[in-house]
Amino acid sequence: MLLALALQVASTPPAPRDGFAESAFAHFSRVQTLTHSSETVDVAIVYAPYSTAPPAYMMRLTRRRFQQPDAIFWADSRSCPAMRPVLDAMRALASPQPQVPGIDPYGDIILDGTGYRLTTRARFANRQDGDLVYSSNIGTPLAAWVDGSLGALARCWSATAPVS
């Protein structure tokens, strides 16, 4: 697990520098280290001043392949009905429990080279805000959610950025 995490961090290049990633409230990714490929999704809310309409969301997918230029795709919740269920499922995602070496038994080591990561805003039960960073390998709720989300959003992506 630690080896896979180290490989994931080492192989994940920075996001495009267009300001979108910085305004996003969530980022999730799947990194396949053995093939030097990754898919990273940044999620941002689209604010409409003085609007009573439900919030809209925008996502950017950055697809990286070995020795190829990055491919950027966009999706918008106003034209992608799959987006809201993906975000609802993110809110319901099961979190792992902290593990203390020497107290807790060690888990299995998986060296398949696929890493999953979610970084998002979070809130504690006492309504205090924080950040959540969750990474794992295959066979976890995070892996299932990322794979399922990428599949659910597959028809939504466009090379043209939506109008905010």
Question: In which residue ranges do the predicted regions lie?
Answer:
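Sec-dependent N-terminal signal peptides
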Residues: 1-9
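Function-determining sites in protein domains
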Residues: 9-164
